[in-house]
A protein has these predicted regions:
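Cytoplasmic-side transmembrane-helix entry/capping segments in multi-pass membrane proteins
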Residues: 201-211
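C-terminal substrate/ligand-recognition segments
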Residues: 216
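Short, mixed-charge, low-aromatic patches
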Residues: 4, 211-212
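Acidic, Mg2+-coordinating phosphoryl-transfer loop and its flanking beta/alpha structural elements
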Residues: 1-32
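Membrane-embedded transport module
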Residues: 20-200
């Protein structure tokens, strides 16, 4: 809802998004509006909607990446404890959380808008942050990274022991393999999170900040 006069104030206040005019609008309208057009140009609304959708998408990408990564760490430590071996040391988990996860998540917040961002229907106000299949994606991606990491630990342990056997206690080779595998999986997973709808190979442009976070 847009308006500039005092009579528009009730409608602007009750609308999901009330927009007031910054130049010709009254003070009453500006005070109750959710957004004020400083240039009174309706075309600015289009740019504001696109930017709002980009920010919301990027928040979902960062949250999805962090939760899937942390889920894989929690599940890996939990199941390895049940099986009687140590998957990762606390210092490994600290490094992954502070270095491997932190910078790619920040880089995902700077992702460019996707090409179809303005062709999507409006999002319902009742939709949660995990709607649209994001919750399911987090679950299966976290489980997948966990399985890959634990398999790499077993392979490293078998290489150290010289034969196939279930690990017990602490295996330096297995722990090294698990640490490197989980770190690389989460780094590549950050590229996977650039879009929930499109393949990373079909996205136009590059997120230079994400590449810098990976190489760093």
């Amino acid at each position: 809802m847009t308006g500039d006069g005092v009579n528009d104030a009730p409608s602007i206040k009750s609308a999901d998004i009330g927009i007031g005019m910054g130049i010709t609008g009254t003070d009453v309208t500006k005070n109750v509006a959710d957004m004020v057009l400083s240039d009174d140009n309706f075309a600015t609304i289009v740019g504001a909607v696109a930017e709002g959708r980009r920010i919301y998408d990027n928040i979902r990408k960062a949250i999805g990446f962090l939760l899937a990564s942390n889920m894989s760490e929690v599940l890996g430590v939990f199941f390895s404890a049940l099986l009687g071996f140590t998957l990762l040391n606390p210092v490994h988990l600290l490094f992954i959380n502070l270095i491997t996860d932190c910078f790619p998540a920040l880089a995902l917040g700077m992702e460019r808008p996707e090409p179809d961002i303005m062709r999507r229907p409006p999002r319902s106000a009742k939709d949660g942050i995990f709607s649209g299949g994001l919750g399911f994606d987090i679950a299966y991606q976290g489980i997948l990274i966990t399985v890959i990491t634990m398999v790499s630990y077993i392979i490293g342990h078998c290489m150290e022991a010289g034969c196939f056997e279930m690990p017990r206690g602490v295996s330096p080779h297995g722990m090294t393999m698990a640490f490197l595998t989980m770190s690389m999986c989460e780094i590549f997973h950050s590229f996977n999170m650039r879009s929930q709808r499109r393949s990373v190979f079909t996205l136009r442009g590059h997120n230079k900040v994400l590449w810098a976070a990976m190489l760093g």
